[in-house]
């Protein structure tokens, strides 16, 4: 069902799960985060920016075109569109994706975009049919999807939602009724040899001023990396 090769999907896996540690450390320095006593509230936003920008910068080498999706003034998401296969991938932390699937009629862009998947068969037995309000919401989604996709020069035939954690990467396809149609597990593509995202910000020494040579020679402890939702 998913035409895009595992090799290309592995790029998305690496972009999401294996962040650029050097970029994280540089961002921390830029906001003055040099010791554990300092705050770094922007870290989680920055981690997403690093993921998204990796897709923007290097996605073309793997067949992807980046699609910027604005969610008001507070958040910009990046979708990865494989133009040859006409597949649009949207990535989320797994808890966030679970929330999107659990509440499909809250107007999230992932739910709106998924109406292009049409009447795919539902793999789960539904206990309740859609009520009239939910059916009306789907009609609204179809109109909203035309506006959403119409902003870009793309014509996706499939929208694939990806959820990841530190040790897993899964892709799902829902039909236009927001029912689960397909699931795929790409966890085997995770390369655990990468540096893991630090759970705590490592201690970072401030940049040294080469002009100040007559300073104390007391050795500073070396910085340690302690390890690796929308």
Report residues per predicted region:
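Conserved catalytic cores of phosphodiester-cleaving nucleases, focusing on short active-site segments
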Residues: 76-113, 117
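Nuclease catalytic cores
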Residues: 44-48, 52, 87
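Glycine-rich, aromatic-bearing surface loops/beta-hairpins
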Residues: 145-230
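Catalytic cores of nucleic-acid endonucleases
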Residues: 102-163
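A short acidic/basic microdomain associated with nuclease active sites
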Residues: 41, 59-88
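Interdomain/boundary linker segments immediately adjacent to catalytic/signaling cores
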Residues: 1-46
């Amino acid at each position: 069902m998913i035409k895009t090769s595992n090799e290309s999907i592995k790029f998305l896996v690496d972009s999401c799960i294996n962040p650029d540690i050097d970029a994280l450390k540089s961002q921390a320095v830029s906001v003055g985060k040099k010791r554990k006593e300092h705050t770094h509230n922007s870290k989680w936003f920055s981690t997403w920016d690093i993921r998204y920008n990796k897709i923007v910068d290097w996605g073309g080498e793997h067949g992807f075109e980046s699609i910027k999706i604005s969610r008001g003034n507070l958040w910009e998401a990046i979708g990865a569109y494989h133009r040859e296969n006409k597949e649009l991938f949207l990535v989320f932390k797994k808890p966030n994706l679970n929330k999107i699937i659990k509440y499909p009629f809250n107007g999230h862009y992932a739910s709106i975009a998924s109406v292009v998947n049409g009447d795919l068969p539902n793999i789960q037995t539904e206990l309740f049919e859609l009520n009239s309000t939910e059916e009306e919401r789907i009609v609204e989604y179809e109109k909203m999807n035309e506006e959403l996709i119409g902003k870009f020069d793309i014509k996706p035939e499939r929208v694939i939602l990806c959820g990841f954690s530190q040790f897993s990467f899964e892709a799902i396809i829902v039909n236009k009724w927001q029912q689960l149609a397909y699931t795929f597990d790409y966890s085997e593509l995770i390369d655990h040899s990468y540096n893991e995202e630090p759970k705590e910000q490592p201690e970072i020494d401030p940049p040294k001023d080469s002009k100040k040579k007559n300073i104390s020679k007391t050795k500073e402890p070396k910085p340690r990396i302690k390890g690796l939702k929308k």
